[in-house]
Amino acid sequence: MKRHLNTSYRLVWNHITGTTVVASELARSRGKRAGVAVALSLAAVTSLPVLAADTVVQAGETVSGGALENHDNQIVFGTANGMTISTGLEYGPDNEANTGGQWIQNGGIANNTTVTGGGLQRVNAGGSVSDTVIRAGGGQSLQGQAVNTTLNGGEQWVHEGGIATGTVINEKGWQAVKSGAMATDTVVNTGAEGGPDAENGDTGQTVYGDAVRTTINKNGRQIVAAEGTANTTVVYAGGDQTVHGHALDTTLNGGYQYVHNGGTASDTVVNSDGWQIVKEGGLADFTTVNQKGKLQVNAGGTATNVTLKQGGALVTSTAATVTGSNRLGNFTVENGKADGVVLESGGRLDVLEGHSAQKTRVDDGGTLAVSAGGKATGVTMTSGGALIADSGATVEGTNASGRFSIDGISGQASGLLLENGGSFTVNAGGQAGNTTVGHRGTLTLAAGGSLSGRTQLSKGASMVLNGDVVSTGDIVNAGEIRFDNQTTPDAALSRAVAKGDSPVTFHKLTTSNLTGQGGTINMRVRLDGSNASDQLVINGGQATGKTWLAFTNVGNSNLGVATTGQGIRVVDAQNGATTEEGAFALSRPLQAGAFNYTLNRDSDEDWYLRSENAYRAEVPLYASMLTQAMDYDRILAGSRSHQSGVSGENNSVRLSIQGGHLGHDNNGGIARGATPESNGSYGFVRLEGDLLRTEVAGMSLTTGVYGAAGHSSVDVKDDDGSRAGTVRDDAGSLGGYLNLVHTSSGLWADIVAQGTLHSMKASSDNNDFRARGWGWLGSLETGLPFSITDNLMLEPQLQYTWQGLSLDDGQDNAGYVKFGHGSAQHVRAGFRLGSHNDMNFGKGTSSRDTLRDSAKHSVRELPVNWWVQPSVIRTFSSRGDMSMGTAAVGSNMTFSPSQNGTTLDLQAGLEARVRENITLGVQAGYAHSVSGSSAEGYNGQATLNVTF
């Protein structure tokens, strides 16, 4: 019992056993000094049985396996291997009141432990654990040593005196290294999921003590608290280190380091894609920025003894303090003055109002931004460098074109080269002379700003006009000139409108000469009859070359009415100016409501927008949607006329497949109220079944239902014969029929009711428009057969059909599209001439034993009937309005294409009984329009009829 020497004991009541036991003075606190210790019951060891809820692993003893749950305790003085712990955190994470779970005492060892939700592994001073896995909701409280702990959503709390080595922190895991504690060789894979520099301190690693040789991977985050220190940390891409305390020897291999107010970072190395950000009140000392690395020092931040290697980037302003060396020597940024700064590879220096910079070099990827009231002298701009300034700044230096300057007092600028994100704003009263705007450069002019000399816009360059602007020199445009209040690029390309409640003020750009080099001028226009737009004024000179004009229709809606007179003047040639024919052209179609607008040059050298006499291509395209859907419905219902050629006493099921060509001739087009010219194809599959077959009052009565699925695709032409677009229609139909046959005379009647859901898409070069709708149809058909000979029959027929259609309204890029209710009536008169052979199959004659009773020996033995059916179809009382327009008064245009006309139709078919209960049929037909706008085309069909 030597292990109990120098230990005092007392009697305590064990509420579990209901007895008094002898316990050490440490029992109440589980062996924790000052309230945190392990209980050891002498009675449990020597005389009383040990309960399963409280187990003790004695020194020198080894236990393997087992689970702790439901308030179980395991106190380890020896060795415990492979335990699973799911209890101990009854009072929450890292709470001193917790007394359950596994307790590793001085000299105790635990290996390969798994801690699950609600579980606690407590490692007291002198205890050690290895290879513990802690899952979500579990925790490890450490005052001893822990090696190779894995946090799979669990937590590790390293207390004073505790050492955690090789901990791996996975998703949603957290390691808290408290004051006086140490964590070495930690791998952090979580913590940064909330975004860069987000203060989500409940995952990843939080350091209040010391962290050494930490590796931070993608999504990993280390937060160094004010009292904490992190030494020799490596941060990879997607990971970051947040420093409120001290960070020493950090290496950023694509990762980020944020140095906050009061934080210090020493000897940081920023490699490719790495980024050190020093915030206000933060300090970075001896930072080395290698190629493609970045150091950012915010206003009020400090970075001293910086080594900026070639290709490294410095981002700062004259409100920060930065000192160090670059490839040209020493540089400083302090007290509102910058000297010797090199900017490249994403580097940027902001010279603020009242501050100054001298000897600044701006290389490829670098940016020098000088605020109004700021001053930069001795600037060297090389290719790819960017200057950002306005006419209130003072800047002088050299660029690829020679010397340049901006006088902040007079507002005069000369020789600027703007590229690669560079921009210059000419304020009211200012002037920019001989300006070159390169790729990704922007020249902005406020109202009252002006240009002089040669203004050159390269491909990819922009000039933005925020008011009336005058150029007394030449403009050479291979880029883009844009008036303000423009739509976004995506919206402009789709001819969308710049919507807003504020009134639009139109502006003028006046220049002596304009040379177009394939550039674009984006202008705003109102197509509501007000004849208002932005204008280009050529004053006394000439417009040559090629310039594309792109117009955006502005206002609260897409306004579109016909222009009057000469139209809307958009280019004004004044004081004897001339414009070459072909100097301007529309960069994209301009449409509003039902109209196309074209750009026209008049004899006065001015250029005007005018509405075309012909409507835009979408007018006939959308109008044809009504006709196409109704044609399909009629053909589908008409296919039933030839389904019942074989009569019998049994119910039957019929499967039909039909395809064909469908079209309408040009009969004057939409302008004359006719259906637009079109041609295309269709196809459908139809399944039909009899439900009831009976005899009533000397008549045979058959009822049934059918369903069909089909598709049609029709190319539509404009009135001038040009392609308008394509309409595609996916249709699903349900119908029912009632067939009556007078037994003695053979007089018959067929009644059909049908409904079809149409899903249509109309595609033109400029629009994709979709509409859904329902079609309804009712048909009454009758016929009376006469026998010409024993095997030849003539049957006069008459059919009346009514159909209707309703399509949803919609919107395209130029305005609304509305459909009125469509309807049409059809009368078909004709006759059917065909054989009238007995279709009784009889006995089988096949030579094959398996088919002897059900098949014929040859095709010649099959019962066969043929028929031909010529008809005249008259379409009348067709209706169907299609309206297009906008919210502008007078913009609405209504079109009512007529389907009225006469068609000659010829159908022919053949049917053969191939089994006692199976009949196959084929048919083909041709329809030709002889007057009006009725449909024409050809078709083919195959039918399988099975009786049962």
Q: What residue spans do the PLM features occupy?
A:
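Extracellular beta-strand repeat scaffolds in secreted/surface proteins
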Residues: 74-76, 100-104, 119-123, 138-142, ...
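Outer membrane beta-barrel transmembrane domains
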Residues: 735, 818-948
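Short, T/G/N/S-enriched strand-turn elements that build extracellular solenoid repeat scaffolds
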Residues: 55, 63-68, 80-95, 110-116, ...
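Outer membrane beta-barrel translocator domains of Type V secretion systems
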Residues: 612-797, 802-804, 808-810, 898, ...
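Outer-membrane translocation/initiation segment of Type V secreted surface proteins
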Residues: 2-3, 10-24, 522-525, 532-533, ...
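Intrinsically disordered, low-complexity Ser/Thr- and acidic-rich flexible linkers and loops
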Residues: 90-96, 193-202, 490-498, 841-859
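Gram-negative bacterial Sec-dependent N-terminal signal peptides
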Residues: 4-5, 9-51
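Extracellular beta-solenoid/beta-roll
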Residues: 323-326, 378-403, 407-546, 552, ...
